[in-house]
């Protein structure tokens, strides 16, 4: 539904370009590189605003999810889109590198890991290309003592185990107010015991498989290398076919521990506690990332006080993963820059017009009816 919403929203915005962005024009050719975790949604985020502003697109999907993009290209053909407007190029990282360095590309829009994003920024430096980066995250999930704990637990299931934690804005760093920490952890462990694990295509399950053995190995090695804190693993046998990693909770970590600082990109939740709201803000901002954050509290004044202090691109209150095509999404720090969606996203696919619309001709003042001495002595509200 959100992918569809992006096309619907941007189709409407395309009709308003002349009236709302009269001094803007299309950038030109936009090179776009998307990841494998949301192949259709990421495609919609990239292509819809680019086409709405009159650009052409060269898009490279991830190696594992090329078929989604190729099917979309066929839909474009059936819809009558002119050849050359949307171009899908499949391949590995070498193909993406060719797109990034091609001299005829006017803009690069990339969603993926921070490491690759850093290399893309280096490659485009000095080239004059426009650049949008939406990178990794280590998003804090803050639970205050006055929060509805049952709702916060359910929200956390969606925040970290949706799509097996393979989400850039996953709430993977749990910060719990000390007065309710024991109760919250108990409720969370009870909920973890009831998580349904199985076929990702089955809509009734909570957690599916990781994308491939490489990702499974990475998650496993990061967790096994950690010796701090207390680990709780969802009980039960994992399905044999597929890269299923059990949902894992690790509590009692130090803010400087590797698992509290680095993006795991899997179904692993790490946690620590805080005593005061100011400490919660300090812990939340104690990372090189800044993509998203979630705050759970029944006190609206507390929420409105905490949210602006969080160094993230988006803050959700008493909810998570709440997105809309009309709202710009993006990060700060090493989570990237630029926005996708909303007016901010549209502006990223435009440039100022070099030739403005001509002004209407104004007739010269003949002097008739003016002051006799030629001096205007009327009162002015300066």
Residue ranges and their predicted role:
Residues 115-254, 283, 317, 364-365, ...:
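ALDH superfamily catalytic-core signature
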């Amino acid at each position: 539904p959100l992918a569809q919403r992006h096309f619907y929203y941007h189709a409407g915005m395309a009709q308003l370009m002349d009236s709302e962005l009269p001094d803007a024009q299309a950038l030109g050719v936009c090179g776009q590189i998307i990841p494998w975790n949301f192949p259709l949604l990421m495609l919609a985020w990239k292509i819809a605003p680019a086409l709405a502003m009159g650009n052409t697109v060269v898009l490279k999907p991830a190696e594992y999810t090329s078929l989604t993009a190729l099917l979309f290209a066929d839909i474009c053909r059936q819809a009558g889109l002119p050849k050359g407007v949307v171009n899908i190029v499949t391949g590995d990282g070498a193909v993406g590198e060719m797109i990034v360095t091609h001299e005829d590309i006017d803009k690069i829009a990339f969603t993926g890991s921070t490491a690759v994003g850093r290399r893309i920024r280096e490659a485009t430096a000095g080239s004059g290309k426009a650049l949008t980066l939406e990178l990794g995250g280590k998003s804090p999930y803050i639970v205050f003592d006055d929060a509805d704990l049952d709702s916060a637990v359910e929200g956390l299931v969606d925040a970290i185990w949706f799509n097996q934690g393979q989400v850039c804005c996953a709430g993977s760093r749990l910060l719990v107010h000390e007065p309710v920490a024991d109760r919250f952890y108990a409720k969370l462990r009870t909920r973890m015991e009831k998580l349904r694990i199985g076929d990702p295509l089955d809509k009734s399950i909570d957690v599916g498989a990781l994308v491939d053995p490489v990702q499974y190995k990475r998650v496993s090695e990061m967790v096994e290398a950690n010796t701090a804190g207390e680990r709780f693993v969802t009980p039960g046998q994992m399905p044999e076919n597929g890269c299923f990693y059990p949902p894992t909770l690790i509590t009692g970590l130090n803010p400087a521990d590797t698992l509290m600082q680095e993006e795991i990109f899997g179904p692993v939740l790490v946690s620590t506690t805080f005593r005061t709201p100011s400490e919660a803000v300090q812990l939340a901002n104690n990372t090189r990332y800044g993509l998203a954050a979630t705050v759970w509290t029944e006190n609206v004044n507390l929420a409105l006080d905490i949210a602006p202090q969080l160094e993230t691109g988006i803050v959700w209150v008493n909810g998570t993963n709440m997105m809309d095509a009309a709202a710009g999404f993006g990060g700060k720090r090493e989570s990237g820059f630029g926005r996708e969606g909303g007016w901010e996203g549209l502006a990223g696919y435009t440039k100022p017009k070099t030739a403005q619309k001509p002004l209407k001709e104004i007739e010269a003042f003949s002097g008739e009816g003016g002051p006799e001495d030629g001096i205007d002595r009327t009162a002015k509200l300066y």
